[in-house]
Amino acid sequence: MFAIIETGGKQVKVEEGQEIFVEKLDVNEGDSFTFDKVLFVGGDAVKVGAPTVEGASVTATVQKQGRGKKITVFTYKRRKDSKRKKGHRQPYTKLTIDKINA
């Protein structure tokens, strides 16, 4: 059984026991989190939401709060001696999917 959930403005396909990385959630490590925006449930019985599946939820456990790999942003204006270099690390949450309730 699998489900498609919406989190952080993105749609993620999840299965039980899977580890996923999502945009940062305001939850402590080790806590349980429930996703209510389930868009699709697949498996033996397929359920398609319009826009979400009624009564469906996905429960996950927070494994880690972290920051992603650093990216460098460099902008310049030619012939003007104008340069700017910035770095950014996107925060993320690592989850383990425990149960899909459909």
UniProtKB/Swiss-Prot annotation:
GO molecular function: rRNA binding; structural constituent of ribosome
Keyword Oxidoreductase belongs to the record: no
SUPFAM superfamilies from the UniProt entry: L21p-like
Bias (Basic residues): 79-91
Sequence segments annotated as region (Disordered): 79-102
Annotated InterPro entries: bL21-like (IPR028909), bL21-like_sf (IPR036164), Ribosomal_bL21 (IPR001787)
One of the record's GO cellular component terms: cytoplasm
Record key words, sorted: Ribonucleoprotein, Ribosomal protein, RNA-binding, rRNA-binding
Superkingdom of the organism of origin: Bacteria
GO biological process: translation
Record function comment: This protein binds to 23S rRNA in the presence of protein L20.
Quaternary structure and partners: Part of the 50S ribosomal subunit. Contacts protein L20.
Family: Belongs to the bacterial ribosomal protein bL21 family.
Protein's name according to its UniProt entry: Large ribosomal subunit protein bL21
Organism: Staphylococcus saprophyticus subsp. saprophyticus (strain ATCC 15305 / DSM 20229 / NCIMB 8711 / NCTC 7292 / S-41)
The encoding gene: rplU
